[in-house]
């Protein structure tokens, strides 16, 4: 007989395991998903790291403060952003932690602020040449006179869930 009591139990257990494996991410989503809308990305600082007068290339260092007011921990695998200076697109940046294990990525602990540092190299173009010239001419004073803003998105991860968070900030 093909369907003995043992085989029926075996097929039932295998079926339950398969259903659990398939639906586990959905269950975790509803149980452990943090509200990514409350996680706050702020552009904390823009500093000049290096100026190359020969090529007019400028390397900037950006600091993002990430505040997590929720009661669940989270982390990020990638932050993509567009940097604007005086409402002119200066460049696109990517801060990636995708090749780093979860325990080595920046942790957004409940009620805490984490700081992320990113470098971006500005390439001169007709659109942004006045901002680059302003930075080259007097780097210490001019960086404070420029209106910096950033628009971007981040992949927020918690347990088995990856959610997209859009952000925008002005400095």
Model regions and ranges:
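Membrane engagement elements in two modes
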Residues: 1-54, 126, 155, 159-171
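Terminal connector regions
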Residues: 122-171
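Asparagine-centered strand-capping/turn motif at beta-strand->loop junctions
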Residues: 50-52, 64-70
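Intrinsically disordered, low-complexity Pro/Gly/Ser/Thr-rich segments with frequent PxxP/GP/PP motifs
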Residues: 87-130
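Short, hydrophobic/aromatic beta-strand segments
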Residues: 72-80, 92-94
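Short, solvent-exposed loop/turn segments enriched in Ser/Thr/Gly
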Residues: 56-63
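Short edge-strand/loop segments of extracellular domains
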Residues: 80-88
């Amino acid at each position: 007989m093909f369907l003995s009591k043992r085989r029926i139990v075996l097929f039932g257990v295998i079926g339950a395991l398969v259903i659990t494996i398939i639906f586990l991410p959905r269950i975790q989503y509803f149980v452990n998903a943090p509200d990514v809308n409350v996680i706050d990305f702020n552009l904390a600082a823009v500093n000049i790291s290096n100026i190359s007068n020969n090529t007019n290339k400028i390397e900037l260092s950006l600091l993002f403060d990430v505040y997590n007011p929720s009661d669940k921990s989270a982390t990020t695998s990638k932050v993509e952003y567009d940097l604007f200076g005086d409402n002119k697109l200066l460049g696109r940046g990517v801060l990636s932690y995708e090749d780093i294990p979860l325990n080595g990525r920046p942790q957004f602990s409940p009620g805490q602020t984490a700081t992320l540092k990113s470098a971006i190299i500005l390439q001169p173009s007709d659109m942004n040449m006045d901002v680059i010239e302003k930075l080259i001419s007097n780097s210490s004073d001019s960086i404070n006179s420029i209106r910096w803003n950033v628009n971007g998105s981040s992949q927020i991860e918690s347990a088995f869930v990856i959610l997209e968070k859009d952000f925008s900030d002005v400095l």
